[in-house]
Regions:
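Bacterial N-terminal signal peptides
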Residues: 9-19
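Short, well-ordered coil/turn segments that N-cap beta-strands
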Residues: 25-29, 55-57, 89-95, 157-162, ...
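The substrate-binding groove and active-site-proximal loops of carbohydrate-active enzymes
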Residues: 29-40, 64-79, 126-145, 170-174, ...
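Conserved, mostly hydrophobic/aromatic
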Residues: 31, 51, 59, 88, ...
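Short, acidic/polar
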Residues: 38-53, 144-150, 274-284, 310, ...
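Aromatic-lined substrate-binding rim segments of carbohydrate-active enzymes
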Residues: 45-54, 58-124, 152, 251-258, ...
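Polysaccharide-binding and catalytic clefts of secreted carbohydrate-active enzymes
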Residues: 125-290, 294-309
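Carbohydrate-binding surfaces of carbohydrate-active enzymes
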Residues: 299-681
Length: 681
C-alpha cells in the first residue's frame, strides 16, 4: 500500500512536470481588452466569442484603470470584473491582470496634492495627462501598495489568471521637482555621501563657486535636457531611477506575498526619454518572471527599421534572462496588411512567446480613440482581426518548438550611467549599443545585452560601445574577462569619466589604458580637420582603412591614439596624415581592441567577420540578404523573408514545411514578406 502511494505521488509529480514543460512550449496570441469602457455583459460575451473564434489564448486587462476598481478611497468594486474573469476562464482564455498603480486616481491627487507633478519652474501641474504622479511620494506609494494588496488578494487564485502586470511603461511620465521630492533627493545624497565634504568633492562644486555648506542648500539640477553640472545631473538621474526601481520592487514583493505562484510581467518602456531609468536592477533580480514590451514596429510592410528597433527593444529589456519574453502590446492601428504577421514571426527569433495586440476594440473616447484596434468602433471585426486570427492559427502549428532559447556567444554592454553621461557627446550610448546590435541582426546571430557589473560575462566576445562611465567594478570585470581569454572591443566615448561623472585626470581610457596598450589624447572635430583633407573630403566624411581596404564612414569626432604597446589594425587615411584609429593589444590570454570612432557597421563589420572565424563563434544560418533566420533546435529552422523579392534558401537535405504542410527535396523559395518553418528530415 505504501509503495502504491509512492507510485501515485511520483506519477503526480511527473504529470505536473510534463504539464509545466508543455506550458513552456506554447505561443500566446491575444489582445489588450478594456471591459471597463463598457460593462455591458452581453457585449463582453460577444467579444469573447469573437476571441475564441480567432483562436486567442490570452487577454491583457486592467492597465491604466485604477479608479475602475477603486472609484473612491477604500471603496473597491471588483464584482463587475469578477464576471469578466469568470467568462474568460470558461472560454479558456488566460488573463494578464495589470495592477494599474499609474495613473493615480483624481481622488488621490485631491487628497494628497504633494503627489501631483511640479515642473522644473515650480508650477504644480493638474493631472490632465496619464502618468502625472510623483511615484516617490510616500502618500502615493502607501495607496498604490494598498491597491496592489487588495487586487492581488482578490484574484491570486482565480483560475483564469496567467500573470499580474506590474505597472505599465514605468519610464514614461514627468519627473517631479516638488519640495517633497527635493527633500527625498537630499536624503538620498546623505545616504550616499555621508558628509558635505564628500558631496562637494564628487560634484566638483569649487567650479563656478557652487560649494555646498549645508544639506538644505542643495537644489535640483536644471531640466533633464540641460548641459549644466554633469556630476549633479548624473546623481539626480540615479536618484530618480532608484525611486522607480524601489517602487517596482515593493509592488513585486506584495504580489509575491499574496500570489506566490503567479507569474509577473511588465511593459518595460524604461528607455522613454522622459524618465529613462536603470531597468537592469529589475532584470537581473529575477523577480520579473516575464519581461515584456510593446512591439510597435510602425505601419510599414516594406521597411524593416521598425522591426529592428523593436527587436532591439526586446534585447535591452531581456538582458540575460532565459525566461520567455512577452510582447504584451503589439501593433494594430493602420498597419499595412501582413506587416503585423511579419513582425510576429520576427519577434519569435528574439525569444518572444506572446503577440498581444493593442488593441481589441477601437476605443470610444479619450486620447487614443483614433488608434484603430481589431474591431471598429461599432464592434465589427476588421482586417487586423483577420490577420491576428491567421497568426494564431499558424502559431498553433509550430508552438511546441517555441519559445526560442537564444544561444549567444557575444555580449553587448549597456550602462545606465553612461547613457545619462553620453548626452554631452554627439553619439549617445544607446545609439552605439544599437549599432553593435545591428551587426548581428544582419548576420542572423544571437547576442545578449549585458550590464557588465551584474554579468558573469560567459561570452567569447564583448562589445563596450561608448560606455562613458567607468568604475572600479566594471573595469575589473573587463580586465578579468580579457585576462582569462576573452576578446573585448571598445569604441570611442568609453571610459571617459569616473563614477561621479568627472573626466579622468589619469591616462585614458580610464582604469583600462594598460589593458588596451594605448594612451588616448584629445579628440578632433572631423568637419574642421577636413579643411586639410588630402582627399578634399568635407563635412564629417572620413576614409577608414582596414587591412588595405578603404571604407567610407562619417563621424563628428575621432580620437587621437598614442600607441603604448598596441598594434594598429586600422587607420584614418583621408586627413592631413594617417591616424591610427583601430588598435589591438594582447593581454593575458585575451585581446583588447580599441576603435577611436563611434560604433558603426561599416567600421566594425570586417573586424567582426574576422573575429567570428578567429574565435570560432557560431555563424547564423546561411541565407540570402533580406531573410531573417534562426536554427531553433537540431533540425528546425525559422525563416522570415522581410524583402519584396522571392528568396531561394539553399538546402542540401530533404525537409518539410510545418507551416504549409509540404515537402522540399532540396532548395526552396520563400515568397516576399512570408515566413517559413521547416523540419530537416
Amino acid at each position: 500500500m505504501k509503495k502504491q502511494k509512492h507510485i501515485i505521488l511520483l506519477s503526480i509529480v511527473i504529470l505536473f512536470f510534463l504539464s509545466s514543460l508543455m506550458k513552456a512550449q506554447e505561443l500566446y496570441v491575444g489582445a489588450n481588452y478594456h471591459p471597463h469602457d463598457n460593462k455591458n455583459i452581453e457585449k463582453i460575451k460577444t467579444d469573447i466569442e469573437l476571441m475564441k473564434a480567432a483562436g486567442f489564448k490570452v487577454v491583457r486587462m486592467g492597465h491604466l484603470a485604477w479608479d475602475s476598481y477603486e472609484p473612491s478611497e477604500g471603496i473597491y468594486d471588483f464584482d463587475w470584473f469578477d464576471e469578466v474573469m469568470d467568462l474568460m476562464f470558461e472560454a479558456d482564455i488566460k488573463v494578464i491582470l495589470d495592477i494599474a498603480i499609474r495613473p493615480a486616481p483624481i481622488w488621490l491627487h485631491h487628497k494628497y496634492p504633494s503627489i501631483s507633478i511640479t515642473d522644473e519652474n515650480g508650477n504644480v501641474l493638474y493631472p490632465n495627462h496619464r502618468y502625472m504622479e510623483d511615484i516617490g511620494d510616500p502618500n502615493y506609494q502607501k495607496y498604490a501598495l494598498r491597491f496592489t494588496d487588495a487586487m492581488t488578494k482578490h484574484y491570486a487564485n482565480h483560475p483564469a489568471l496567467l500573470a499580474f502586470g506590474i505597472d505599465n511603461e514605468s519610464g514614461d511620465g514627468r519627473i517631479s521637482y516638488s519640495e517633497t521630492s527635493r527633500q527625498r533627493f537630499i536624503t538620498w545624497l546623505k545616504n550616499k555621501y555621508t558628509s558635505i565634504d564628500n558631496l562637494n568633492k564628487a560634484w566638483a562644486t569649487h567650479r563656478w563657486s557652487r560649494r555646498i555648506n549645508q544639506w538644505d542648500e542643495i537644489g535640483f539640477p536644471p531640466g533633464i535636457n540641460s548641459n549644466d553640472m554633469p556630476e549633479k545631473m548624473l546623481d539626480f538621474r540615479r536618484f530618480v531611477s532608484d525611486e522607480i526601481n524601489q517602487l517596482l520592487f515593493k509592488v513585486l514583493d506584495v504580489v509575491n506575498t499574496n500570489a506566490p505562484n503567479a507569474l509577473t510581467n511588465t511593459n518595460a518602456w524604461y528607455f522613454s526619454p522622459l524618465k529613462y531609468f536603470d531597468y537592469s536592477e529589475i532584470a537581473y533580480s529575477g523577480k520579473m518572471t516575464r519581461e515584456g514590451e510593446g512591439f510597435y514596429a510602425g505601419n510599414s510592410l516594406t521597411t524593416n527599421w521598425g522591426v529592428m528597433n523593436t527587436a532591439f527593444g526586446i534585447s535591452r529589456i531581456q538582458f540575460e534572462s532565459t525566461n520567455p519574453f512577452w510582447c504584451t502590446e503589439f501593433t494594430t492601428m493602420t498597419a499595412v496588411p501582413n506587416s503585423i504577421r511579419k513582425s510576429a514571426y520576427a519577434s519569435l527569433m528574439y525569444g518572444n512567446q506572446m503577440v498581444c495586440g493593442w488593441t481589441w476594440q477601437s476605443m470610444w473616447a479619450g486620447e487614443e480613440q483614433y488608434l484603430i484596434g481589431m474591431l471598429d468602433w461599432d464592434g465589427v471585426p476588421n482586417r487586423k482581426y483577420d490577420e491576428y486570427k491567421q497568426i494564431a492559427r499558424e502559431f498553433k502549428k509550430i508552438e511546441k518548438y517555441f519559445p526560442y532559447q537564444l544561444k549567444a556567444e557575444v555580449g553587448l554592454a549597456f550602462s545606465f550611467p553612461s547613457q545619462i553621461a553620453s548626452k554631452y557627446f554627439p553619439e549617445q550610448h544607446e545609439n552605439q549599443l544599437q549599432a553593435c546590435w545591428d551587426l548581428f541582426y544582419w548576420r542572423n546571430m544571437d547576442t545578449r545585452v549585458v550590464e557588465i557589473s551584474k554579468s558573469s560575462l560567459k561570452y567569447k566576445l564583448l562589445f563596450v560601445p561608448g560606455v562613458a562611465v567607468m568604475d572600479e567594478v566594471t573595469s575589473a570585470k573587463i580586465r578579468d574577462f580579457v585576462k582569462n581569454g576573452g576578446t573585448v572591443i571598445m569604441t570611442s566615448n568609453s571610459a571617459i569619466v569616473d563614477e561621479t561623472g568627472k573626466v579622468f585626470s589619469t591616462t585614458r581610457p580610464g582604469l583600462l589604458n594598460d589593458l588596451f596598450g594605448i594612451r588616448l589624447g584629445s579628440f578632433e572635430e572631423t568637419e574642421t580637420m577636413n579643411e586639410i583633407s588630402r582627399k578634399s573630403y568635407r563635412g564629417k566624411r572620413l576614409e577608414f582603412n582596414y587591412k588595405g581596404k578603404a571604407i567610407n564612414t562619417e563621424s563628428t569626432r575621432f580620437d587621437i591614439i598614442d600607441l603604448k604597446g598596441a598594434e594598429v589594425l586600422g587607420k584614418l587615411t583621408s586627413l592631413d596624415k594617417d591616424y591610427p584609429i583601430m588598435t589591438s593589444n594582447n593581454f593575458g590570454k585575451g585581446r583588447a581592441i580599441y576603435v577611436g570612432l563611434p560604433a558603426k557597421g561599416e567600421v566594425l563589420g570586417a573586424l567582426l567577420d574576422d573575429l567570428i572565424i578567429e574565435l570560432n563563434i557560431k555563424k547564423g544560418p546561411d541565407v540570402p540578404s533580406g531573410v531573417m533566420a534562426r536554427q531553433i533546435d537540431g533540425n528546425h529552422f525559422l525563416y522570415m523573408n522581410v524583402s519584396g523579392q522571392p528568396k531561394e534558401i539553399q538546402m542540401k537535405e530533404k525537409s518539410r514545411s510545418i507551416l504549409f504542410d509540404k515537402d522540399y527535396s532540396g532548395n526552396f523559395t520563400i515568397a516576399p514578406y512570408e515566413p517559413e518553418f521547416i523540419e530537416i528530415k
